[in-house]
A protein has these predicted regions:
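Helix-loop boundary and gating motifs at the non-cytosolic
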Residues: 7-67, 242-297
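Helix-to-loop junctions at the C-terminal end of transmembrane segments
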Residues: 71-83, 173, 307-320, 405
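A membrane-interface helix-boundary motif in multi-pass transporters
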Residues: 174-201, 405-431
């Protein structure tokens, strides 16, 4: 009888493909993602409240894309060389510093918006620098045929934080709102978001500490030393051929998402201006500003993602990875058009964000399709190479989205009158092109059925 509890734990761990290192990684991802999601999804609103225009918000998104393009490859190479434990510890600490810069930005007056850009250099370190390290840990810990389930375990922990984080942010915004369901004043947005960022700093430090203390680096799979730009070129030339159709389709879909991602919060809080007023048993009447309701919408999105991610990951063992990845791409593509055309109704927005959660169901399969063909010991570099190409192409997407969203006036040239519907409609067209390309030319990873 004494062995029964351990056996039950083993079965639960097996269900989620949670080897020890993957479990530790998942716990760290939960803590860090809790803070990052609370902060990053509201940054467009924060910047506008600090005085930024839509074009500047778009430039912020493009700067984020630059960092996403630059960080993953050296991050993967560092992980392959020094091991995932020390790499992720360093990246996590840098991210906490970035959150702190965002927190202090309003105190610097006219420099507040530029400091948002400075803070991003640090804040995105764990997310982008650590990408190769997180992929490599799963790659070396989980059998090839179960990669989708291994990634599903880390994604489930991370997405659980993505559910809890926005609810915490919503509670903070609700505490600072002075109107029932009307949009908050800019000063109120700034005051509330400073507290959100303080929580983000705490969670980032906790995640970094947990990962460093609990992770067993004895099984780290070390690669060769980084050989400079020539190695980057070699890795790109040697990218497994199965990845090329996925890379092209994925790049188009992510370009589309990048055009509008930083503007989702502005559509809810300022373009549609949708809050929530409802009565619940025991609790009574609840009135949420659009800023607070956006956090609830993000939680709804993540709830759907969590409910579907593990079952869909297991489904890949029957239907393969490609159909699941294509489903995620399709949801990415059509969501912008659906959102911008939605009526200013809280229930409709809740349904749309629930639909958007389906895009995350394909992420574990997508990651398995990326890292599956990689040789052991090179998982970090293959992942970094893939994301390097994708993220370089996606760099201008947010700036383009900002121009289409808010328009642009150039002295001596003229004025381009953009609009939110124009930006979101164009994003859907680009996303559908990427989805169609992958459906026609995408390949399956043979180990799934092997």
């Amino acid at each position: 009888m004494a062995s029964e509890p351990a056996s039950l734990r083993d079965r639960v761990r097996e269900l989620f493909a949670l080897e020890r290192d993957v479990l530790v990684l998942s716990v760290a991802m939960f803590a860090f993602s809790l803070g990052f999601q609370m902060a990053s999804r509201y940054l467009g609103e924060y910047m506008v409240a600090l005085g930024a225009s839509a074009v500047v918000v778009g430039l912020y998104g493009t700067f984020s894309n630059v960092i996403s393009a630059i960080y993953p490859y050296p991050g993967g190479a560092i992980s392959d060389r020094i091991g995932s434990r020390y790499a992720l510890t360093m990246f996590g600490f840098l991210s906490a510093v970035g959150f702190g810069v965002w927190l202090l930005a309003p105190a610097f007056g006219a420099l507040a918006v530029p400091l948002i850009f400075v803070g991003l250099v640090f804040a995105q370190a764990w997310k982008s620098f650590g990408l190769g390290a997180t992929f490599a840990i799963v790659k070396q810990s989980v059998p090839p045929a179960r990669l989708a389930e291994g990634f599903a375990s880390t994604e489930t922990f991370r997405r659980t934080a993505f559910l809890v984080g926005p609810l915490l942010a919503a509670a903070v915004f609700a505490a600072f709102a002075t109107t029932d369901t009307g949009s908050m004043a800019d000063a109120q947005v700034v005051d509330a978001f400073v507290y959100v960022l303080a929580l983000a700093v705490v969670f980032a430090l906790l995640g970094t500490l947990a990962q460093h203390v609990l992770y067993d680096s004895g099984d780290d799979d070390f690669g060769k030393a980084f050989e400079g730009i020539s190695q980057v070129a070699d890795d790109l030339r040697n990218l497994p051929p199965e990845l090329r159709p996925l890379l092209i389709g994925d790049t188009l879909v992510r370009f589309a998402n990048g055009m509008v991602y930083v503007f989702f919060v502005l559509v809810v809080t300022r373009f549609l201006g949708v809050g929530l007023s409802t009565t619940l048993p025991v609790v009574g009447t609840i009135d949420l500003s659009p800023q607070a309701y956006f956090g609830v919408l993000l939680a709804i999105e993540m709830a759907v993602a969590l409910l579907t991610m593990i079952p869909v990951a297991k489904l890949t063992r029957r239907v393969g990875l490609k159909p699941v990845v294509a489903l995620g791409f399709a949801v990415y593509a059509i969501f912008p058009a659906l959102l911008i055309a939605a009526p200013a109704d809280a229930g409709v927005l809740a349904a749309l964000f629930a639909f958007s959660g389906l895009r995350f169901a394909g992420l574990p399969a997508h990651k398995a399709l990326i890292v599956g063909p990689a040789e052991q010991g090179a998982g970090g570099r293959v992942t970094g190479s893939y994301y390097l190409v994708r993220n370089v192409v996606v760099i201008p997407s947010a700036a383009l989205g900002g121009v289409l969203y808010g328009g642009l006036a150039l002295p001596g040239v003229g004025t381009f009158a953009g609009s939110p519907p124009l930006a979101f409609g164009a994003a859907t067209v680009v996303g559908l092109l990427g989805t169609g390309y992958f459906l026609v030319f995408g390949e399956e990873f043979a180990a799934v059925n092997g």
